[in-house]
Amino acid sequence: MELWQAFVQMVYTLTPWFDGTIASILIILIKAITLVIPLMLVVAYFTYAERKVIGYMQLRIGPNRVGPKGWLQPIADALKLMTKEIIFPTKANIYLFLLAPVLAIAPAIAVWVVIPFDEDIYITNLDISLLYVLAIGSIGVYGIILAGWASNSKYPLLGALRSASLLVSYEIVIGFALATVVMIAGSVNLNTIVQAQQGGIIYWNFIPLFPMMIIFFISALIETNRAPFDVVEGESEIVGGTHVEYSGMTFAVFFLAEYANMILMAVLAVVMFFGGWHSPFEAIPYLESAFSWVPGIIWLLAKTTFFMFLYLWVRATFPRFRYDQIMRLSWKVFLPITIIWIFVVALMTQLKLEPWF
């Protein structure tokens, strides 16, 4: 962080002919670039990791032709999508058809500005950062709904209707699950929530909130349209859903938005339930000093990688659920459990159950 502060000071020093506002805008643009480029690279190579991991799980090799051991496969995929023609359905609303992927990718990137990667590594530190994530993150589904309607095609419309109903169902569940974390931390600031979990793995929220952690993880799979809950796309039912009529870069943007949201949900699970950037060995003799050299951002990335692997593991293991089963899971199982657990956490907070409350 000291290096970043020195860089900011250098920008102000080297631009004396700018007023403070222009220099501040320049800093914001630099921050945006340093966020978006690594995020897009991670998304691109997560697709490679997904194909490799699932390939090994299914006793296949996975991509291994483009570059050494297939490392250049994401670049080849990007070039292919960039050179493919964008085909518009005959009776589609072209302007809304093109707006839909933008509306899907913009929130998927915008939410990252409040994610704390370490104690002092973040784009901005909002006091209401969790509310910001929930509010901005929920906008992306309107891109999917708009894509289904603007395509003027029956399968995309069915996918859009499913997406709308799942949004109503699981945004409530996720909100209630994360409300229990807020009750423990006493704040909706993500930095404060992570700081409340310092002291070692015993202080992490997943221990007192284990049912909420499981519900959040499953709901995250559903919200991001991941197998076995990918009924919005459902190739065997609605042949791709909202993506049926999209090709070329418009399809690629939807693809990037989906994977960016997957990584976001993995990071959010780590921040809310697994101590964020904190080491699991804090307050443990010998181990704490042995791993004291590891930066906090490395711990956060390691935990996030584990959750991203769980995404792939679940996809390769379970068959797709029916749409009615997923809706029943929300309203008849998850919602009652989260409401009950809110009262349980409230009671434990009043009793000041150590060491979490």
UniProtKB/Swiss-Prot annotation:
Bilayer topology term: Multi-pass membrane protein
Query: Which EC class heads this enzyme's classification?
Result: translocase
User: Where mainly found?
Assistant: membrane
Query: Could you list the residue ranges that cross the membrane?
Result: 25-45, 94-114, 130-150, 166-186, 201-221, 254-274, 294-314, 329-349
Q: Quick one: a GO biological-process term for this protein?
A: aerobic respiration
Give the EC number(s) listed in the UniProt record.
7.1.1.-
Sorted keywords for this record are: Cell inner membrane, Cell membrane, Membrane, NAD, Quinone, Translocase, Transmembrane, Transmembrane helix, Ubiquinone
> What GO CC annotations are associated with the protein?
plasma membrane
Which reactions appear under catalytic activity for this entry? a quinone + NADH + 5 H(+)(in) = a quinol + NAD(+) + 4 H(+)(out)
Q: What does this protein do?
A: NDH-1 shuttles electrons from NADH, via FMN and iron-sulfur (Fe-S) centers, to quinones in the respiratory chain. The immediate electron acceptor for the enzyme in this species is believed to be ubiquinone. Couples the redox reaction to proton translocation (for every two electrons transferred, four hydrogen ions are translocated across the cytoplasmic membrane), and thus conserves the redox energy in a proton gradient. This subunit may bind ubiquinone.
Q: How does it assemble?
A: NDH-1 is composed of 14 different subunits. Subunits NuoA, H, J, K, L, M, N constitute the membrane sector of the complex.
Q: What is this protein called?
A: NADH-quinone oxidoreductase subunit H
**Which taxonomic lineage does the organism of this UniProt entry have?**
Bacteria, Pseudomonadati, Pseudomonadota, Gammaproteobacteria, Candidatus Pseudothioglobaceae
Q: Which gene encodes it?
A: nuoH
